């Protein structure tokens, strides 16, 4: 039933006694019956010889080979032939009104027959098939009585049992019956109780409101995309990206990174410091880069605080007084001093390594990281089911999986860098992973993240909005999201 949308409640009361009740007057709409129920407190209406209270619901319809459209054509031809007489008598007739009158007359005959207890064996004054034929055909042209009798004698109705309900053990029954618009269907109940049918009137999904329209009408819904961000949301990337967008490597298709080994490289720390500002693996790498830059700046400074001369300045000195040689000697002395300091620092770090080994032999060292907060996943670029995933920072704890409710911060961009959507402050965006509440690229790209993790996901058009154009998003657009996972519920 994924192609139909419910739009209104359908309800029908089918009384006991075998009376035929039209499913929908005039067969004017498509509907779906989802429940049949009886009232266990209702007083049973026992028929002759019946001792057990129960009700059987039946569905009745005309045979599939009955051509109702043919009767419509006959009506049109008949109306054309009599058009002159109708104009003399006061104008063209109302076909809808005539059909309703015929149906009402047929139903009245059914009710009169049901109320007459003495006429069960008498078929001379009432023809059940003829009455049903009038209801089913509805708009059939008026013919002679002999022609009606001949057509009604061949009418055989399809009668099917839907369910049997018992007020003591089985008061209701879930159903899944869809009746199309224009389809003539009747219900009747035999037994002791009235049956109540409920469901929904439905329309095709393509005629209903689009998913985007519903999101636009309810901007406060926590699962919506805010596709018209405020100006203050279009500024810098904030604490989500940490200036990673400006990285020159992002513009390269296949960047090559060369690892430089140095004597000053610290051994990997097995235990975080006990200070207030504890850092993750990524922040340690950033700190190491900052330290290298700071030491390089100190190496270029003179003892009196003056900066070392540049190559251009050295050339000028050489031309003037030949003082460049003295400068070179001074620079070599500084390098020797720094080499000595570097050697001492290396020995101190080797001592640290030994100290860590001793601690490991003595037992686990207390740490600020809890046992369950191990990092999840690996850094780098990978492709999963067509979605490009670039982990910038690994989170801690269990990985998000289908069925989890996740809280996210994100910034959405097009390939040209234009931001079309963002959630960087206030209430985070939450949704249930893997349940189709977001575009397919998000269900694929968010899976596997841990709390605190940051990644960039590049989603191809067929996993985003495809050929559908949205405000700020052209059709067939590749979308790039920088996301951060805040919480897993």
UniProtKB/Swiss-Prot annotation:
Q: Please summarize the record's notes on activators and inhibitors of this protein.
A: Inhibited by both FK506 and rapamycin.
Enzyme Commission numbers on file: 5.2.1.8
The UniProt keywords, alphabetically, are: Chaperone, Isomerase, Nucleus, Rotamase
Task: Give the main localization category.
Answer: nucleus
The record's listing under Pfam families reads: FKBP_C (PF00254), NPL (PF17800)
Looking up InterPro entries in the UniProt record yields: NPL (IPR041232), PPIase_dom_sf (IPR046357), PPIase_FKBP_dom (IPR001179), PPIase_Fpr3/Fpr4-like (IPR023566)
Query: Localized where?
Result: Nucleus
Compositional bias (Polar residues) spans?
Answer: 362-378
Its top-level enzyme class, in one word, is isomerase
Q: Could you state one GO cellular component term attached to this entry? A: nucleolus
Biased region (Basic and acidic residues) positions are 93-109, 267-282, 292-303, 328-353
Chain intervals for the UniProt region annotation (Disordered): 40-157, 199-378
Q: Name one GO molecular function term.
A: peptidyl-prolyl cis-trans isomerase activity
- Reactions the enzyme catalyzes: [protein]-peptidylproline (omega=180) = [protein]-peptidylproline (omega=0)
Annotated Acidic residues bias: 66-88, 110-125, 143-157, 208-250
Q: Where is the PPIase FKBP-type domain?
A: 406-489
Q: What is stated as this protein's family in its record?
A: Belongs to the FKBP-type PPIase family. FKBP3/4 subfamily.
Q: What does this protein do?
A: PPIase that acts as a histone chaperone. Histone proline isomerase that increases the rate of cis-trans isomerization at prolines on the histone H3 N-terminal tail. Proline isomerization influences H3 methylation thereby regulating gene expression.
* Assembly, per entry: Binds to histones H3 and H4.
Q: What is this protein called?
A: FK506-binding protein 4
Taxonomic lineage of the native organism: Eukaryota, Fungi, Dikarya, Ascomycota, Pezizomycotina
The encoding gene is: fpr4
């Amino acid at each position: 039933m994924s192609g139909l949308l419910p739009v209104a409640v359908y309800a029908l009361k089918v009384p006991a006694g075998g009376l035929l009740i039209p499913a929908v007057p005039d067969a004017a709409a498509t509907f779906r019956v989802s429940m049949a129920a009886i009232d266990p407190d209702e007083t049973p209406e026992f028929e002759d010889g019946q001792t057990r209270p129960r009700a059987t619901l039946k569905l009745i319809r005309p045979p599939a080979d009955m051509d109702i459209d043919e009767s419509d054509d006959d009506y049109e031809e008949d109306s054309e032939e009599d058009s002159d007489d109708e104009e003399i008598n006061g104008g063209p007739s109302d076909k809808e009104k005539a059909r309703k009158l015929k149906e009402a007359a047929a139903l009245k005959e059914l009710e009169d027959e049901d109320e007459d207890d003495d006429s069960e064996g008498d078929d001379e004054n009432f023809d059940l098939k003829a009455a049903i034929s009038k209801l089913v055909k509805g708009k059939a042209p008026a013919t002679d009585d002999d022609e009606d009798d001949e057509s009604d004698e061949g009418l055989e109705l399809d009668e099917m049992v839907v369910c049997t309900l018992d007020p003591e053990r089985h008061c209701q029954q879930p159903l899944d019956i869809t009746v199309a618009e224009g389809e003539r269907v009747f219900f009747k109940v035999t037994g002791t109780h009235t049956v109540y049918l409920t469901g929904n009137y439905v329309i095709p999904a393509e005629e209903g409101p689009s998913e985007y329209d519903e999101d636009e009408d309810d901007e406060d819904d926590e699962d919506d995309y805010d596709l018209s961000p405020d100006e203050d949301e279009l500024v810098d990337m904030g604490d989500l990206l940490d200036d990673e967008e400006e990285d020159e490597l992002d513009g390269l298709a296949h960047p090559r990174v060369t690892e430089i080994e140095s004597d000053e490289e610290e051994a990997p720390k097995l235990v975080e410091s006990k200070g207030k500002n504890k850092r993750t693996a990524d922040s340690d790498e950033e700190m190491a880069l900052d330290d290298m830059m700071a030491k390089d700046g100190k190496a270029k400074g003179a003892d009196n605080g003056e900066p070392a001369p540049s190559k251009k300045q050295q050339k000028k000195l050489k031309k003037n007084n030949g003082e460049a040689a003295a400068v070179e000697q001074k620079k070599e002395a500084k390098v020797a001093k720094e080499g000595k300091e570097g050697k001492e620092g290396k020995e101190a770090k080797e001592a640290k390594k030994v100290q860590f080994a001793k601690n490991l032999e003595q037992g686990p060292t207390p740490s600020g990281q809890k046992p369950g907060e191990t990092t999840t996943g690996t850094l780098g670029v990978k492709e999963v089911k067509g979605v490009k995933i670039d982990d910038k920072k690994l989170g801690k704890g269990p990985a998000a999986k289908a069925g989890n409710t996740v809280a996210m911060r994100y910034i959405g961009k097009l390939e040209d860098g234009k931001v079309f959507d963002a959630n960087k402050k206030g209430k985070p965006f939450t949704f249930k992973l893997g349940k189709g509440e977001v575009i397919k690229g998000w269900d694929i790209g968010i899976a596997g993240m841990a709390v605190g993790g940051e990644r960039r996901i590049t989603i191809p058009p067929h996993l985003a909005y495809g050929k559908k154009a949205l405000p700020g998003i052209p059709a067939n657009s590749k979308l790039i999201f920088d996301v951060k996972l805040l919480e897993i519920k």
